[in-house]
Amino acid sequence: PTHLHVIATVQDLDLEKRATRFDEPVGIAFANNQKAYVALSSENKIAVIDVASRLVTKHLSIPAQDPRALTVRHGKLYVIPFESNNKTQLSGGYKIDGDLVTFDAHQHSIAHNNVLSLGHVLDIIKHPRVPDKDLFVFDTETDRLIETVDTLGTLLYGLTVDSKGTVFIAQTDARNDVNGRSGTKKHGLAELENRAFLNQITRVEFQKNAAKKPHFIDLEPLPPVHPKPGQAFATPFAVELSPDDKTLVATAAGSD
């Protein structure tokens, strides 16, 4: 009688504030028959759920924006944030150096109304000190964070893990820094070459829980070479491996 029927729901309510703590659940994965994980995208957390009681027992903090896709393989939970960043930011600061800092951010945004202030030289730059955390690996037995991997892409969509623990991530890497020198070098759309993102699959191998250097599989030629008409891809989204690990299958979201 319960076939294809909802048999239960999971909620986590703050009774004093009359608000949910189970906000924007997106991805789900099971550690085993007793424990499940749910990505709470807008909360930047993973809810840990006891399957038998259907109650949230705790949360895992994800210090990145919008964790969505997650999967479990061989006792490890793998989580990627959707908007992971790519170290880019406006070139503001205090001491202007003409490279990473091209305008006084305090004078522009705090001391004066930034809508009224004129004459500031604004670039989009890649700053080495900006965090870019892209992959989080947890031990499903203890829920302890094992490893964090940086710089795997900008918008991270789907992930899968093979039998050896190699991670594959469907992602698009933003090129907003390619024409970012709009202030100092007067960059415009021409420098972007109509390629705002690179469509890629990122491959990450591990050795004793430590990530090796990632490998980027380009789905299209890299600029200045461009795909021929009819050969460009839409956004790489879902990704999955065949049971024998020999074939990687991905979808292109937005394809006609």
Where are these regions (language model features)?
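Short loop/turn segments that connect beta-strands within beta-propeller blades
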Residues: 2-3, 50-54, 139-143, 206-209
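Surface-exposed loop and turn segments in beta-propeller and other repeat-based domains
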Residues: 5-20, 83, 101-116, 130, ...
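Beta-rich, blade/repeat-based domains predominating
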Residues: 15-32, 63-73, 132, 153-162, ...
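Conserved loop/turn motif of beta-propeller repeat scaffolds
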Residues: 33-34, 74, 164-165, 245, ...
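Conserved beta-propeller blade signature
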Residues: 35-38, 77-79, 166-168, 247-250
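Loop/turn residues immediately N-terminal
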Residues: 43-45, 84-85, 133, 174, ...
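Short, conserved, GDST-rich strand-edge loop motifs in beta-rich repeat architectures
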Residues: 80-129, 169-199
